[in-house]
Amino acid sequence: MGKKVTGACKENKVTEPVKRVYAFGKDAQGNNVTEGNTTMKATLGGKGANLAEMANIGLPVPPGFTISCQTCMEYANAGNVWPEGVLDTIHKYRLDLENRIGKKIGDAEDPLLVSVRSGAPMSMPGMMDTVLNLGLNDESINGLIRQTENPRFAWDSYRRFIQMFSNVVMGLDGDLFENAINAMKAVRGVKSDTDLTAEDLQELVAEFKGIFTENVSGEEYPALVVDGSVQFPQDPMVQLKLAIEAVFGSWNNPRAVLYRKKNKISDDLGTAVNVQCMVFGNKGNTSATGVAFTRNPANGAKEFYGDYLVNAQGEDVVAGIRNTSPIAELKHVEGLEEAGRELEEIFVLLEYHFHDMMDIEFTIEQGKLFMLQTRVGKRTAAAALHIAIDMEKEGLIDKKEAVRRVAPDQLDQLLHPQFDKNADYDVLARGLNASPGAAVGEAVFSSADAVAAAEAGRKCVLVRWETNPDDLAGMIAAEGILTSHGGKTSHAAVIARGMGAPCVCGVEALKIDAEKKQATVAGTDVVIKEGDMISLDGTSGIVVLGAVDLVMPELTGDLDTILEWADGFRKLGVRANADNPEDAKLSRDFGASGIGLCRTEHMFLGERKQIIQTFILNDDEAVREKAVGELFEAQTGDFYGMFKEMDGLPVIVRLLDPPLHEFLESPRALDVEIARLEATGGDKTLIAEKRMLMERIDGFAEQNPMLGLRGCRLGIVYPILPEMQVRAIATATAKLKKEGLDPKPEIMIPLVSTVAELEKLRAVAKKIIAEVAAEEGVELDIEVGTMIELPRAAVTADEIATQADFFSFGTNDLTQTTFGFSRDDVEAEFVPQYLQEHLLPYNPFATIDPGVAKLVEMGVKLGHEGNPDLVCGVCGEHGGDPDSIHTFNKIGLDYVSCSPYRVPVARLAAAQAALEEE
């Protein structure tokens, strides 16, 4: 059935006259009567504004008029009711257009045909609807035949119009019409639409009108009922009204809504509607249509790029019905030479005028060129870099504009493997694009199996309900991580981004049975078994059954050039979050000016986990001291490697932060193990030991561990732990100083809420640093600061700053504690619904929330009151988010810190933030 479109037109009272319709193009005397320009995108949409601009600079643009974006929103917000007077205004502009052209829409002698196209303020290619050849009916078809002396062209145009109108405006399934065309070709024994004769197409028109009558409801569209049955509308004004309503309605079609959400485009902008005289590329071999770019959008090369078709309409180029020809050949085609040369001249003119690479749609009608659209062309990351640099060299833009031209998030394309764009695959499921890049490997369902697969030389993808610290070895071994639970700041997402591993999280359709080592996908009969090849794309969040070919983007000097320019403009420093020398080196290679967060808890995993468990679970002080001694030796080596790799640059080491239960066995897993032993008649002594261990672990259980015994509280209750860590930091520093290096460690105390907590632990740290300095005979100047990740810490930052050399805002936990959210739960449970219902504008764990940002701003201001020399940074996941970086720049932070692979992104975003404030 067709989609709902208001039948009878109701009027909405408006007191103030508002201009809602704008003309573009020339009048009958050749004078430009355009009422807009390229600066009016918010009103005319991108397409309408640029049509007006092309008309203003004298390019051959078919005339027409544009209905404003605001009219679309008024119409939608009033429940699909037209604002008062708008239909009368449209009628006036339609009459004006007819006078300018000297033809009338629907005229039986010499009909004017128009297109009705969408055009939002922000480019949304292919997301909304278009209707072509509007104005054809059973009378005007005869006029078109007489004027063109080409019956086949006329009937083909009418056929196309009915098909497009039925699909776009009435919502009928396009296959109804394609099936009829295919049946006709089969009967005629031909393969291509172009092989059908005028008589065939006339027969199809009659059949198409029958399909329309059978599938459109007279109850929904009473105005279309004639003699008791629905008929294809013959009144051009009815056609036009319904088409405009359909384009307005397409603003809220599912694909457009999804596109806006993905690209952070407001839902309140609306789309303009462009009503434009049709020109035809299917009037014979001196007619053509095409789409082109003024430069190569794939690699940025300065060459004309695109395709055209002779004797075709615009949708044929993108529909793939016929093989296209490269745009460079157009000027060599007989009958099209002059138009081809003129087009290339226009390419140069458009670049000179807009100072950017432009995307163009054109039609040549019997040798005469017409420009149907121009807009800033979409391009790959590699092309964006190359074009920006070339245009700076050519004098079209300066270095500042070149830096502005590259979208920071685009750089992900250059740093990670991607699905081959030519690969053929079907999407099995979708989740959150948690960590960019693509991975292919056999599915494994446990960390141990991932390690085993990697050791055997087999690539694998770790598939889990959600990951935890126990899975680290498997995450490192796997090519990528796939989880059915968790959000963009879940354990899997954070660790994957830090490692530069592709990750797709929160695939709700994925039902994982870890014991059976398989997963099913809701809504399908697919079962993913251990060893099955799967592919995932962490950039887009898609999962594919089978192996998809991957490609690694080629890095060029263009990236270094743009980032070097960016560094000259940015105010924010950019550091990295790294926990090992390998990541530290990568961070430095990517241009990080230090390490903003070294998480020491990651150093307690793997083989060392048994040591920390011994400390936690054993009451014997001698045993515990021995365990701490082993940890000291291990940590000293860790810090030595980190500080050496970052020689001369700051490394902020966060003392142990997580609750102790994270280092212990899972009670659930232990309970399952005990049940298995009992069911299989296992060793009773072993069962008893497991039960004792269970009781001991239960003693560390907390109702809300993330707000319990962790961070600085852990250091106060178990002082031996921070003492050991500080001593290891100081010892590693002293050793490197003796070797002639310049280590610059800084100690960060986490989860402080009162100045008393920080004062106590700072005193402990300074005492141990002094002891090590005396023992080693070197001078140690190690700063001590804190993380501001609790609201109380932010609002008492002036007090806390008296005991701190620096603040690092932990915006992950600050967001949790400000909202009262449990991050790992809410991202999967209700944040998606909140986003859908506009209760949240975006995920606050991905982009900093204004309320949380106010706490950061307050913390910075108060902190400087307490300590004017205080250095302030941010080390949460927001540190790599371009939108958040703009906020942090305004607040006046000194640096942001992010995962190594986000460092180039942050450098560019920081420069753009600084330029935005100029």
Where are these regions (language model features)?
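Nucleotide/phosphate-binding sheet-loop regions of phosphoryl- and nucleotidyl-transfer enzymes
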Residues: 2-426, 458-461, 468-473, 479, ...
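Protease-associated
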Residues: 3, 396-477, 542-550, 559, ...
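A short, small-residue-rich loop immediately preceding and capping a beta-strand
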Residues: 479-485, 503, 873
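Conserved nucleotide-binding/hydrolysis modules and their immediate coupling elements
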Residues: 492, 508-512, 517-522
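Short, ordered loop/turn segments at secondary-structure junctions
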Residues: 66, 70-72, 467, 486-488, ...
